[in-house]
Design a protein with these regions (language model features):
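Flexible, low-complexity linker and terminal segments
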Residues: 1-19, 169-334
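Thiamine diphosphate
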Residues: 28-110, 120, 124, 133-152
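Core active-site phosphate/anionic-ligand binding loop and the adjoining beta-turn-alpha structural block
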Residues: 90-206
Length: 334
């Protein structure tokens, strides 16, 4: 048997089967150290070693043995229970959670998206185990996170790597760009929770490499030529709505507006999210896109998508709270 598994039950079974031999070796090594140092007293130490159980050994001692790698699919039934079982089992485990889809409907007839449910929420849940190292990142950001990845691999306790690697076919973008846009739009932000960094959640938690983390949405300048071929520069926010626009399954929630109807009734999605209009008819939200003729166009967004963007923003705001940052700052002020 090896040390790589695609389900938690098989990994736990292998670990428990090998545990007696591991404990025997640890006892023998500990006994040998005492004998070499001339400190072994049979009447004192022999009963102690005879009564040792698995819980008497620490994660640091178990790290001399190979870790168990468990690869999980976030779409698999019961993945939340499997993940909790793996991280609380005491097994030296590295869990790779592969997130393929962030925009799947929660259930037929429900007007909500389960975006990030199997990714961000599972990774956030893992932080509650305290001694677990947690890293979440889009696949496009893994190179930038290599130092954190190495820390997670060296961590003596359980480790979770939650990675968004989008499946081909759903997005109009190549996989690498789809992953990058998920992180850019706050749909799948990168963060880490490292128990080795300090005693409290605020020092352990870090928002990793997210663009402009102090604002709701990253802002960039776009320069384009208008109808008179004059250069126009506009500041744009890349929101969750922009991420949604690239997903073919949700095209029915968008509509291109002919240039002749670019009137005062349209407001940018960024403006709508900052201050939703009381009367929807007076402020239809839109995002910019490029059509097949490489011309800039405006695409209006229905309210359902805008509400999904609001929930995405709320989840982004909750991340520091989950990491204990705000609570620790409040305690410091008191």
């Amino acid at each position: 048997g090896g040390f790589a598994f695609d389900n938690v039950s098989a990994a736990l079974a292998a670990y428990r089967e090998r545990l007696p031999d591991m404990l025997s070796l640890l006892k023998a090594l500990s006994l040998a150290e005492l004998e070499v140092e001339g400190q072994f007293v049979e009447q004192l130490h022999a009963p102690i070693f005879d009564g040792m159980q698995s819980q008497d050994f620490t994660a640091a001692e178990l790290q001399f043995f190979p870790d168990y790698l468990v690869a999980l699919d976030s779409d698999a039934p019961g993945v939340q229970a499997d993940l909790a079982n793996a991280l609380s089992s005491g097994m030296p485990v590295k869990v790779l959670l592969e997130v393929r889809d962030l925009l799947e409907e929660a259930a037929p007839g429900q007007g909500r998206f389960s975006f990030g449910m199997r990714g961000s929420q599972l990774a956030s849940m893992a932080m509650t185990f305290g001694d677990a190292f947690v890293l979440q990142s889009a696949a496009s950001n893994l190179l930038q996170m290599r130092d954190r990845l190495q820390r997670g691999l060296r961590h003596a306790g359980p480790t979770l790597f939650s990675v968004y690697a989008p499946a081909d076919g759903e997005s109009t973008l190549p996989g690498y760009l789809a992953a990058a846009s998920a992180m850019q739009s706050r749909a799948f932000p990168a963060f880490s929770y490292d128990p080795g960094r300090g005693p409290d959640s605020a020092t352990r938690f870090s928002l990793e490499n997210n663009p402009q983390p102090d604002v709701d949405w990253p802002l960039e300048f776009l320069t384009y030529a208008d109808q008179d071929l004059q250069a126009v520069t506009e500041e744009l926010a890349f929101t969750f709505v922009d991420f949604l626009l690239a997903d073919r399954r949700h095209s029915r929630h968008f509509a291109v507006v002919p240039r002749a109807h670019w009137g005062e009734g349209l407001i940018s999605a960024r403006q709508w999210l900052e201050s939703p209009p009381a009367d929807a008819a007076t402020g239809l939200p839109y995002v910019l896109a490029v059509d097949d003729a490489d011309l800039l166009c405006r695409v209006v967004v229905d309210e359902r998508m805008m509400r999904a963007a609001q929930r995405c923003r709320e989840a982004w705001h909750r991340l520091p709270e989950l990491g204990g940052i705000h609570a620790s700052r409040a305690e410091a002020l008191l």
